[in-house]
Design a protein with these regions (language model features):
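Short histidine-centered catalytic/ligand-binding loop motif
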Residues: 107-121
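Protruding loop/beta-arch "assembly-hinge" segments enriched in small, turn-prone residues
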Residues: 171-193
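Acidic-leaning, charged glycine-interspersed low-complexity segments
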Residues: 118-176
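Small/polar-rich, solvent-exposed N-terminal microdomains that initiate assembly or binding
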Residues: 1-92, 185-193
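Active-site-adjacent structural patch at catalytic or cofactor/ligand-binding sites
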Residues: 79-111
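A short, hydrophobic secondary-structure junction motif
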Residues: 65-70, 106-108, 129-134
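Solvent-exposed loop and beta-edge segments used for protein-protein assembly and interaction
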Residues: 73-75, 92-96, 153-159
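Short acidic alpha-helical/loop segments enriched in Asp/Glu that coordinate divalent cations
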Residues: 47, 94-96, 115-118
Length: 193
């Protein structure tokens, strides 16, 4: 009888954090660093029951995906984000349109910031918009195309921000053995290695 063993990794996955051909992972890492270095955003998430260092917010209150555990008896404030590559601009195969989507989910019992009287999700939205709108944080200018308030069930007041940016469309390729990247010329006969 053969014994099953868990496969061993064949590479260092942290390479994807900086490779030019892994936009989804690379951009989410840039967003993570920006959010965790912004003490005002972390303050407004109001995780006061926890004594956290900035990096401890990641995976608990700052999430690189949009899933909130509604089965949890305690509701907290969350800042979720995702990337999406939705289309290629007309007449150009060299670029793709990236959407960076933020979901700011604030516990309805904690919506109003006591010192300012402004809803927390609006304040966090303003801080994110200040830093990303018309910036070149990802190499090309990002612009805000949606800013929408809503609710999810009875627990959260939310605000969704969608930023759009044109990025190079997979024109680089990295050899994972040598970590060398090169630009592709869209030649179907080109040898990759």
């Amino acid at each position: 009888m053969e014994i099953f063993s868990t496969p061993k990794p064949t590479m260092d996955y942290t390479k994807f954090l900086s490779l030019p051909d892994s936009d989804n992972i690379r951009i989410k890492n840039v967003v993570k660093q920006k959010l965790l270095s912004d003490s005002d955003i972390l303050y407004l998430l109001n995780a006061s029951e926890d004594d956290l260092e900035p990096e401890d917010y990641f995976g608990k209150y700052v999430l690189p995906y949009y899933i909130i555990d509604n089965a949890n008896a305690e509701t907290h404030n969350y800042l979720c984000y995702e990337t999406s590559f939705v289309e290629i601009p007309r007449y150009s195969e060299v670029y793709k349109v990236m959407q960076l989507i933020f979901y700011i989910c604030i516990n309805v019992k904690d919506v109003i910031h006591p010192q300012s009287g402004i809803p927390r999700h609006d304040l966090i939205s303003a801080l994110i918009t200040r830093d990303i709108n018309w910036s070149e944080a990802f190499g090309m200018k990002c612009k805000l195309i949606q800013d929408k308030a809503s609710t999810t069930d009875l627990h959260y007041a939310t605000r969704t921000l969608v930023f759009e940016c044109e990025l190079p469309n997979g024109i680089s390729k990295t050899n994972m053995n040598t970590d060398e990247s090169h630009f592709c010329n869209n030649d179907p006969d080109e040898e990759w290695w």
